[in-house]
A protein has these predicted regions:
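ATP-dependent phospho-/nucleotidyl transfer catalytic cores
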Residues: 504
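Beta-strand-rich recognition domains
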Residues: 722-725
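Accessory carbohydrate-recognition regions in carbohydrate-active enzymes
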Residues: 30-443, 447-499, 507, 512-533, ...
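Signal peptide processing junction and immediate N-terminal pro/mature segment
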Residues: 22-29
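Extracellular attachment/recognition segments
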Residues: 732
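N-terminal secretory signal peptides and thylakoid transit peptides that target proteins
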Residues: 1-16
Length: 788
């Protein structure tokens, strides 16, 4: 069935519905439960989820999408410590003020504060050799983390540490057992692995700081800046710090050489400052720090605006209240305590990034390194992991937080205008990192247009998008347009680029139509099928092609490339997973693979294959079920593809197995990098029973709900999702009801859910093989996407 989106909405709202009474069913349609204020989502969250294994999350104290993430750093020199913290570590270096959440690359960790007793030590040491360094041992039994708060007792000094945060500031409270000191280390930060393929660690490499400044600016005020060249090469960060004790005894260091006594300010590259605290044991020592990407004056203004007082407990209470409101957008009832904790922690991790990157006065540093000004309502943000988050994180926001979704999308459009590189790829604090392939920001923008997000100036955006689509010859785009594929002997990651450029073409066609460029839109829609040039019917896999048109040899579907000299033909996946990457053209995949039965068999083979990977596979291909890899994003939509060939009950079985075996509420509870909330967003949506295989299409595919009841605050009201009878064995959907009537399709339009309503999944322990089997009940084939 080929439908435009307009046809889809009409059909979705008016197709023949069967009433429950006519079907002989009785459903509980009573009053909504759990609205009496007794639901406390903050108490269910464990920020430690994902801090172990390859999750790369941080237990730092922060607010939703805040600029500051104040938390402990245990290591900066290995891949699994990209966030600065790993649950396996036994020592803490100190507490820095911003951290990436779940990423596979490392940066930030600005303004490290080290509280200690005893002699002043300047050496950070290493996790393997902490002796003689300023690191201190700790036990997880002495840690506590909750949204907006972190606490730990340091074993070596006995200092009790508490941390909390506002949007732009972090607040510390230290209880010293004896005289001590605070060390501020501006040399501290990420030391990312130099080899992006092997992810080999380089713990001997220092953070690259080229310019820094530290200054005593008042009786209780310290200010500073640094210019850092790591993943975000050239970013600038400034801070203002107030301390609750006198700054009478301070010591400055440049490259660990002490400045003369009486020094009140210093400039250089490798700066540290020690505040000596002879009376530290007499009262708690309070520290509050604000950050700015603009200048020191901006940091001071942020500090005065958000943390004018010294009431640590009030800041902590306010943070908890903010998180209660944020997490209350999705409430779930029933299930096990483990499932409740996993769900709440996943929802929490979808609200860490992107991060605020605008001062309280409206100034921000843009993608052109210039200082701009706007309103707080417009805002500016950082840390968009778009290759990951276009899949589930941004679609989740279109449902549960459409205002925030619109703010992010409009910000991304502004970045496209400000950046010398055009469309953002992976922007971090005003710097384009150029990380990952494709320009999946266009998927985020197109989805927003399809779902009716307002305020997107498409006419101004389209020339930027068009230039990329038709004029840019870099990144393999010239052969992609000329040959229909990118040759593996000339361009790295050629197979994945060919596949993913097709997804982007599909999205750019929507933007073109919105701009009135319909001829360009038609060309882009046709070009979005280029992925088919890589499908090899002899092997049943997509394969890299060479310039002469032949498939690259040798071929092993487990490999990321065709030879050891140029082994990365695929991006964070192999041919097993990449064969199903055309999420925008599922009917096309079914056609080239030989029809419904053959497509179903290929999916079955993916999940049944031996999970062994080749020795050179990177660690971020993880969370394996067969050759399906939940631990990396290219697989995230694949379990839902069964709906297109009429067997959604297999989606239900696969999705429940993934949720049950690869997610839990422990530090190792994520199957891979959380990637700024994408890994967690997959769980949130899957637990609700829906997923957006093609975000641009504007439809949700049904899966298998995890909880008997969920309440979602949507833009149009409240969406209640019920699953009577759901349980460990009752994972199969028998029937679906929407607003009291039987719903015969295995999908539903976003426009339906966004208005709010009552979605009921009748569950059972055996598959209903008739549900979603009929061709007219399957997800539609889109010839084009019409705009609302």
């Amino acid at each position: 069935v080929a439908l435009s989106r307009r046809d889809l909405i009409k059909a979705s709202a008016t197709f023949a519905l069967v009433s429950p009474r006519a079907a002989g069913l009785r459903l509980a349609m009573g009053p909504i439960l759990g609205t009496s204020g007794d639901y406390d989502p903050v108490a269910l969250v464990d920020p430690m989820v994902g801090t172990g294994a390859h999750g790369h999350t941080t237990p730092a104290a922060c607010l939703p999408y805040g600029m500051v993430q104040l938390g402990p750093d245990t290591d900066t020199g290995r891949w699994d410590a990209c966030s600065g913290y790993h649950h396996d570590d036994a020592t803490i270096m100190g507490f820095s003020h911003n951290h990436l959440s779940g990423t596979g690359a490392s940066d930030l960790m600005d303004v490290l504060v080290v509280p200690r007793t005893g002699p002043l030590v300047l050496d950070p040491g290493t996790r393997e050799r902490p002796e003689g360094s300023y690191r201190q041992a700790f036990d997880h039994a002495d840690e506590r983390a909750e949204p907006g708060y972190y606490a730990v007792r340091l074993k070596d000094s006995g200092i009790a540490v508490e941390l909390t945060a506002t949007a732009r500031t972090g607040m510390h409270r230290y209880r010293f057992p004896a005289a001590g000191h605070l060390l501020i280390d501006l040399t501290h930060g990420a030391r990312p692995a130099p080899d992006p393929i092997s992810l080999r660690d380089d713990p001997a490499r220092d953070t690259d700081v080229t310019e820094a400044m530290l200054q005593i600016a008042g009786p209780d005020l310290i200010v500073g800046s640094r210019h850092v060249h790591e993943w975000a090469d050239g970013r600038q960060i400034h801070f203002a710090m107030r301390v609750s004790c006198a700054l009478d005894q301070v010591r400055f260091f440049n490259a660990d050489v002490e400045a003369p006594a009486g020094t009140r300010g210093i400039a250089g590259a490798l700066l540290k400052l020690a505040i000596m605290l002879p009376d530290a044991a007499t009262a708690p020592v309070l520290v509050k720090v604000a950050l700015s990407g603009v200048d020191v004056a901006g940091a001071i203004a942020n500090l005065d605006a958000e943390a004018p007082d010294w009431d640590f407990d009030q800041v902590r209470r306010a943070a908890r209240g903010t998180w209660t409101a944020q997490l209350g957008r999705v409430r779930v009832f029933g299930g096990t305590a483990e499932q409740q904790g996993t769900m709440a922690s996943a929802l929490y991790h979808t609200a860490i990034a992107p991060n605020l990157f605008i001062d309280s006065d409206g100034r921000y540093r843009g993608m052109d390194s210039a200082v701009h000004s706007t309103t707080q309502a417009v805002g500016n943000f950082s840390a968009y992991s778009l290759w990951d988050t276009y899949r589930a994180f941004h679609p989740l926001l279109t449902l549960v937080d459409p205002e925030r979704c619109g703010q992010f999308v409009r910000n991304l459009v502004t970045m496209a205008h400000e950046s010398p590189f055009g469309l953002p790829i992976w922007p971090l604090q005003g710097i384009e990192t150029h990380c990952m392939i494709g320009w999946h920001v266009v998927v985020v923008i197109a989805e927003a247009l399809v779902k009716g997000v307002k305020g997107i100036d498409v006419a101004a955006l389209w020339p930027i998008v068009r230039s990329l689509a038709f004029d840019d010859d870099g990144h393999g785009l010239e052969p992609y347009r000329r040959l229909g594929y990118i040759p593996a002997d000339t361009v790295r990651e050629s197979a994945s680029k060919t596949l993913e450029y097709g997804i982007d073409d599909w999205a750019m066609a929507v933007i073109a139509d919105a701009a009135g460029a319909h001829d360009d839109a038609a060309k882009l829609r046709a070009r979005s099928h280029n992925w088919r040039t890589l499908y090899d019917p002899q092997t049943g896999f997509v394969r890299p092609r060479l310039s002469d048109g032949t498939f690259a040899e040798p071929f092993d579907p487990r490999a990321l490339g065709h030879d050891s000299r140029h082994w990365r033909d695929f991006t964070e996946c192999n041919a097993w997973q990449a064969t199903f990457l055309a999420q925008h053209d599922v009917p096309g995949m079914i056609a080239v693979m030989g029809g419904d039965a053959a497509f179903e068999a290929r999916l079955d083979a993916l999940f049944a294959a031996d999970s062994t990977l080749l020795p050179d596979a990177p660690p971020d291909i993880s969370g394996m079920i067969g050759q399906y890899a939940q631990g990396n994003e290219p697989s995230h939509h694949v379990a839902y593809l069964y709906a297109w060939c009429g067997v959604p009950w297999k989606t239900q079985a696969r999705v429940r197995a993934i949720m049950d075996t690869l997610y839990n509420a422990t530090p190792a509870g994520l199957p891979g990098n959380d990637d700024c909330g994408q890994m967690s967003a997959w769980y949130v949506l899957s637990a609700l029973g829906i997923y957006p295989v093609d975000p641009v299409s504007g439809i949700w595919i049904f899966g298998t709900p995890l909880f008997p009841r969920a309440e979602v605050m949507v833009g149009g009201g409240r969406l209640v999702i019920e699953a009577p009878g759901v349980g460990p064995d009752a994972i199969y959907v028998q029937r679906v009801h929407w607003n009291g009537r039987v719903w015969n399709r295995s999908w539903i339009a976003h426009a339906e859910l966004a208005r709010g309503g009552h979605l009921v999944f009748e569950m059972g322990s055996h598959p209903n093989r008739d549900f979603g089997r009929a061709p007219e009940s399957r997800p539609p084939r889109f010839e084009s996407i019409a705009l609302p």
